[in-house]
Amino acid sequence: MEEIQRYLQPDRSQQHNFLYPLIFQEYIYALAHDHGLNRNRSILLENPGYDNKFSFLIVKRLITRMYQQNHFLISTNDSNKNSFLGCNKSLYSQMISEGFAFIAEIPFSLRLMSSLSSFEGKNIFKSHNLRSIHSTFPFLEDNFSHLNYVLDILIPYPVHLEILVQTLRYWVKDASSLHLLRFFLHEYWNLNSLITSKKPGYSFSKKNQRFFFFLYNSYVYECESTFVFLRNQSSHLRSTSFGALLERIYFYGKIERLVEVFAKDFQVTLWLFKDPFMHYVRYQGKSIMASKGTFLLMNKWKFYLVNFWQCHFSLCFHTGRIHINQLSNHSRDFMGYLSSVRLNPSMVRSQMLENSFLINNAIKKFDILVPIIPLIGSLAKENFCTVLGHPISKPVWSDLSDSDIIDRFGRICRNLFHYYSGSSKKKTLYRIKYILRLSCARTLARKHKSTVRTFLKRSGSELLEEFLTSEEQVLSLTFPRASSSLWGVYRSRIWYLDIFCINDLANYQ
């Protein structure tokens, strides 16, 4: 990044207009593939591949071809004869698209660093902690228990590839880079395969994750920009958390066009959505907006979002993709947890002089539970148990060593306990732990052609120790016997700031 900054340093006023020449720099592809330039072994000797291998020699040959021939003229007559679109088009497109994604991130990274540098010394937030998935749940615990209604929103998909190009045009003003992006999108992938989870686009996103996530996040940021705008316009105290979000050109013109749908007076429209208790969270292609306001206010927000996305993105957005739910009467599947706001009744006895009376008090509490049925379904899909939750052996792992089998089962159990540590009721987790432990024992018994009882007698406590989580290991040393303190810790919620992704159960790398 320092070398890129030196490249863009001579003319800061036009630094966003010179991204295209970086495509022909070799170190860009090294950075995109997380290769260091000063390693002991030569990268040039690596074999080219489609998954995780990379070769500078292939990139140099590709760049030479791009200089010698004009491969970017799309023609229906000679597309079959074009060597660039031949047998190696998947490898070439993968390398260039990942390099392009790294280059296109430069304007965003420079602006983000300059914005975060202004917060140094103020201790407003730590960005590396906010990367964790668990960082969202303390925010929900602190705020959602005081709110009434929530909007469950499915983020709309762009109906045309040109929308993705136009979205980046506000940030990257390099016409050559945008033409290259347009070439990738129109030549190799169509809309349905790029954004949705159909097979062609799904394989593309698996191989070009950086490129895919960059395009999708740019589009989602464009969808969310209206919340930043309205929040800053309707609030006298600007929120410092929006300091890293920068507005784009022509946005005010689009807002004024949208205002014509609601009212002639823009200030009246802003007054309708002035809500200091509005909270917004996005996750997994969905988003939720919670408010302390009434059902009428949430209904206004719903139709505002529908009209905004229809006018701004020229797409047909159905109102059925936004649902209004009352927090106290609705449970939702949120990031693998089952979250809800419950009313916990409590009885308070009050004594005044000689008279005593009881006061019924209901307190709202944000409750987070572990969904047992989806977890058992995931374990059944990976052949750890039946659909009813009965443990079975896993014959695919019978060829592995005993230590590898125990380590794989133990890693899955520890990962599940680590992620679902925020649940206050861990009875479900101990049932999952029982399924995995017995499935491990049956797999080992199947390998050694013995019964489960015989194997457990021979292994003793070694198998049990492998399934202990980090919290249980500490508790077993601190509290050698069961006590009230031990069970109190078991019931407590623990949120970790080192969980950045949710891996599949079958991913053991």
Curated annotation (Swiss-Prot):
It is found in: Plastid, Chloroplast. GO terms for biological process: mRNA processing; RNA splicing; tRNA processing. GO terms for molecular function: RNA binding. Pfam families: Intron_maturas2, MatK_N. Keywords: Chloroplast, mRNA processing, Plastid, RNA-binding, tRNA processing. Signal peptide: none annotated. HAMAP family: MatK (MF_01390). Belongs to the intron maturase 2 family. MatK subfamily. PANTHER family: MATURASE K. This is Maturase K. The gene is matK.
